[in-house]
Amino acid sequence: MGVFTFVCKNGGGAWSAKQHEGELESSASSTYELQRKLVQVSLSADSSGGVQSSFSLVSPTSAVFQVIVGGGGGGGFSAGGAASSGGGAGEAAAAPKEDEKKKEESEEEEGDFGFDLFG
């Protein structure tokens, strides 16, 4: 698994990026194109699996871009834990009642402030 963090800057109408604590770099005319190039540069250094990336503007002319290669993580949906041992049905039935109590309490708290968030 490889994690590549880039510091990106906009100067003269073009975006450039240098790897934080590394040698990788790239440049492009738009942030979209820069991100695509940085993913390719990262994959050339480590092609061990899937890719995740995150782009965050820090100011209008600077940003941080992170590429994670491998690691097996991926999206937010996972089937792990879907199969459970028997005997948990009683707990599952009790859970909705607790949720209802919490919902009622939160509705009461809204009334204490004199406004309704959802109305």
Curated annotation (Swiss-Prot):
In residue numbers, the region (Disordered) covers: 79-119
Q: Does the keyword Phosphoprotein apply?
A: yes
Question: Which UniProt keywords are given for this protein, alphabetically ordered?
Answer: Phosphoprotein, Ribonucleoprotein, Ribosomal protein
Q: Among its keywords, does the record have DNA repair?
A: no
- Where does this protein have compositionally biased stretches of type Basic and acidic residues? 96-105
Question: Which BP terms does GO give this entry?
Answer: translational elongation
**Ranges annotated as spanning the membrane:** none
UniProt similarity note: Belongs to the eukaryotic ribosomal protein P1/P2 family.
The name under which this protein is listed is Large ribosomal subunit protein P3z
Lineage here is: Eukaryota, Viridiplantae, Streptophyta, Embryophyta, Tracheophyta
Instruction: Give the gene name.
Output: RPP3A
